[in-house]
């Protein structure tokens, strides 16, 4: 059984985060039963990002950090975006090599530090799909 836990933020944010992550698992990774996802709602104080996804020890354990100052709509969209990255790691579409700036996307190596963020293929996919899934969250009345 998948484990999804939200920490930080307020109770409403934690409830929304857990429901959206559970929904996204069903949409993107319906056959996965051993995912361990922790959502940390915190002050990111980062001008360039409102969320991050990190694979932990293996491609079943993840930490998602989301800026707790986001409004509900942006919170949902950001979690959908980061869950697309979870899918990419879990399905081994993406693998990054910590500290070297290199990442592999579907077998091809990219230097993430030398490629424009919005031109990275995993980001292109996440941005392309985030609104589709955020709209589904609202349409399906997940929250």
Residue ranges and their predicted role:
Residues 116-121, 125-143:
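Long, well-structured alpha-helical subdomains associated
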Residues 1-57, 72:
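Auxiliary, metal-adjacent structural segments of Zn-dependent hydrolase domains
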Residues 13-17, 76, 118, 122-125:
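Hydrophobic (often cysteine-bearing) scaffold residues that line and stabilize catalytic clefts
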Residues 62-79:
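Short pre-active-site segment immediately N-terminal to the catalytic Zn-binding motif
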Residues 2, 27-34, 93-95, 136-143:
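Surface-exposed helix-capping loop/turn segments at secondary-structure junctions
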Residues 73, 89-123:
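Post-HEXXH active-site segment of zinc metalloproteases
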Residues 77-89, 126:
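Active-site recognition of the HExxH zinc-binding catalytic motif
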Residues 54-59, 103-105:
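Short alpha-helical hairpin
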């Amino acid at each position: 059984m998948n484990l999804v836990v939200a920490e930080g933020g307020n109770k409403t944010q934690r409830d929304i985060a857990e429901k959206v992550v559970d929904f996204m698992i069903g949409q993107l990774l319906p056959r996965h039963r051993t995912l361990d996802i922790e959502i940390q709602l915190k002050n990111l104080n980062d001008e360039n990002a409102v969320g991050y996804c990190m694979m932990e020890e293996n491609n079943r354990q993840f930490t998602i950090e989301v800026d707790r100052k986001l409004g509900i709509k942006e919170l949902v969209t950001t979690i959908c975006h980061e869950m697309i990255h979870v899918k990419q790691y879990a399905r081994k579409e993406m693998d990054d090599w910590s500290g070297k700036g290199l990442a592999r996307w579907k077998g091809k190596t990219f230097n993430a530090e030398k490629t424009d963020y919005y031109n990275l293929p995993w980001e292109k996919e996440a941005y392309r799909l985030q609104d589709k899934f955020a709209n589904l969250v609202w349409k399906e009345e997940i929250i």
